[in-house]
């Protein structure tokens, strides 16, 4: 009798394990199509913000439409599901993107009218963010992830998609984002010389009483100067270039000049190829928005088309078409567990699809890769860089 019980127990255990394992190696659970120009490896940790798409627009024009629509944050609760709350407050146009936060069970949720909502625990043990909290100094609803890995996103935020990224704080405590300028504007001083600074962290180039141009040390980008024959010169990669003065009284920057800008016979100033290459490198980053990272923010990494959260769980589209994090391995019956990318427009995509759907579930929205009912509306999941504020 004992022997029979042992066999039955072993059989049940084997059945349970077999039921959990995906039907094939999970890393091969990927769509057949890929997004043109999509990035499958992203160097840094990022979050997502929900961007509603007009229901009257087609998928091909969705990116343009989304830029003028509301920005909504997604949250993740403990079971890995991605969800969003309703009735979030409006966001300043200078706001950084809304961060997605993650709680214990892996579900992603966002509260209403706050970016730092109080977190509560419901009867089944899942942790969820509350609605209508009024936390101070908020500009957008934060997305959170609870323990089960589900991802949730907020509704009714009113900020356009930002193209600026760096975050600063003004006197009244509000957080503002500046643009990702690749080079400073070129200016001309009184004696006709042309100057330009790029991403300097030290003092700008100044002009003293006799009209000479001087530059301070510890600049991260070299100032442009003009020597006696009218040519414009600029140094590159100077981190602490000392300033020297030549016999004609003009000031020039010293060493580590790779290629000087030159002036051709018609008076036009030409930049070096190194400068244009630097600008091109900056423009290849598809993510053009940032958000402050807080406790519980959904943090994701993308490598080789596989999406993971801060706990190492696998981002997948499960059997009911919901986007959530589980495992590894991903949840049994998962449809896709690989094939993720960030599109050239900065949106998260699975295969060749960057349109997801937020579907109302109580006070939150769950996220799906397909339209599954009348309570669903199309959205983009905008990738956002996360920074410590």
UniProtKB/Swiss-Prot annotation:
PIR1/2/3 repeats lie at residues 71-89, 97-115, 116-134, 140-158, 164-182, 183-201, 202-220, 221-239, 240-257, 258-276. It is found in: Secreted, Cell wall. It comes from Saccharomyces cerevisiae (strain YJM789). The record marks 81, 107, 126, 150, 174, 193, 212, 231, 250, 268 as: Covalent attachment to cell wall glycan. InterPro entries: PIR1-like_C, Yeast_CWMannoprotein_PIR, Yeast_PIR_rpt. This is Cell wall mannoprotein HSP150. Residues 1-18 form the signal peptide. The lineage of its organism: Eukaryota, Fungi, Dikarya, Ascomycota, Saccharomycotina. Its main location: secreted. The PIR1/2/3 repeats are required for the covalent linkage to the cell wall. Their number varies among different strains of S.cerevisiae. GO terms for cellular component: extracellular region; fungal-type cell wall. The record marks 72-73 as: Cleavage.
């Amino acid at each position: 009798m004992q022997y029979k019980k042992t066999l039955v127990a072993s059989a049940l255990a084997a059945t349970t394990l077999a039921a959990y394992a995906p039907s094939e190696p999970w890393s091969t659970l990927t769509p057949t199509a890929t997004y043109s120009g999509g990035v499958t490896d992203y160097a840094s940790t990022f979050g997502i913000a929900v961007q509603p798409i007009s229901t009257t627009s087609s998928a091909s024009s969705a990116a343009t439409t989304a830029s003028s629509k509301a920005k909504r944050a997604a949250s993740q609760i403990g079971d890995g599901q991605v969800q969003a709350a309703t009735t979030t407050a409006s966001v300043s146009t200078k706001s950084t993107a809304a961060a997605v936060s993650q709680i214990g069970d892996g579900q992603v949720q966002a509260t209403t009218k706050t970016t730092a909502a109080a977190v509560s625990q419901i009867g089944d043990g899942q942790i969820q963010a509350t609605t209508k909290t009024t936390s101070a100094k908020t500009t957008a609803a934060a997305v959170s992830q609870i323990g089960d890995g589900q991802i949730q996103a907020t509704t009714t935020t009113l900020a356009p998609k930002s193209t600026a990224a760096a975050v600063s704080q003004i006197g009244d405590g509000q957080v503002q984002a500046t643009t990702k300028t690749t080079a400073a504007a070129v200016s001309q001083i009184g004696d006709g010389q042309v100057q330009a600074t790029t991403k300097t962290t030290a003092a700008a180039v100044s002009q003293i009483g006799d009209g000479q141009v001087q530059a301070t040390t510890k600049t991260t980008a070299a100032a442009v100067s003009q020597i006696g024959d009218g040519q414009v010169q600029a140094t590159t990669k100077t981190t602490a270039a000392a300033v020297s003065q030549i016999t004609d009284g003009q000031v020039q920057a010293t060493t580590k000049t790779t290629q000087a800008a030159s002036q051709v016979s018609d008076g036009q100033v030409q930049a070096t190829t190194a400068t244009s290459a630097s600008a091109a490198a900056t423009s290849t980053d598809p993510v053009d928005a940032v958000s402050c990272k807080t406790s519980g923010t959904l943090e994701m990494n993308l490598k080789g088309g596989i999406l993971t959260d801060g706990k190492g769980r696998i981002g997948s589209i499960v059997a009911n078409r919901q986007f959530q994090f589980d495992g590894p391995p991903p949840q049994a019956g998962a449809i896709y567990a690989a094939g993720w990318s960030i599109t050239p427009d900065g949106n998260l995509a699975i295969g060749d699809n960057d349109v997801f759907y937020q579907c109302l579930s109580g006070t939150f929205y769950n996220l799906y890769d397909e339209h599954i009912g009348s309570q669903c509306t199309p959205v983009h999941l905008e990738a956002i860089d996360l920074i410590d504020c």
